[in-house]
Amino acid sequence: MSTKPKFNTLTVLVVGLWIFGTGDAVIIAAGLGVAPWTVLAQGIGIQFNWTIGQATFFISVIVLFLWIPLKEKPGVGTILNAILIAAAIDVMEPYLPHPEQQIYQLIQVLLGTILVGIGSGFYLTANLGPGPRDGWMTGLQRITNIPIGRVRTTIEIIALLIGWKLGGVFGVGTIIFAILIGPVVALFLQLTDRIWGIN
């Protein structure tokens, strides 16, 4: 992993992370339920009177500390992931529509999921380090030899349940995101890799 990335690679990373955070904000504004980690951020935000972006950044910092016993090493992308996604959520969410009709809420959740997929494709193609949560999951997988899918599912269910108990919003949007995000990320990762060929 390069610690001195090329300008175009860094640009792809930054743009991707901002798109990712904007996608999160679009889903939040829909009001129909959010991604598991965002449910946790909402819950923490409610308890401490923080914005969702502030709570998201807090979670990222805590998770990075959990890298230490796993001997994972953050990259440029790891640090920027923690900062930019949280910033994008707080900057973009107030300017987004907050629909009341369910059909428009569903459309907004789908749009947000697509944006998260596009953003993921960008930042993963840049290959400058995993996000805090992804690095923690892969580190746990390496240490425990438990399949990554099972590790990811277990952690996200725990994050979801804690967030829900703290007041985060679990709903149809959460289920839609959980079902679609894998295929959407895979699609846009393939497309961005073809376009930029950074990897």
Q: PLM features: what roles do these ranges have?
A:
Residues 1-199:
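Core subunits and conserved enzymes of cellular information-processing
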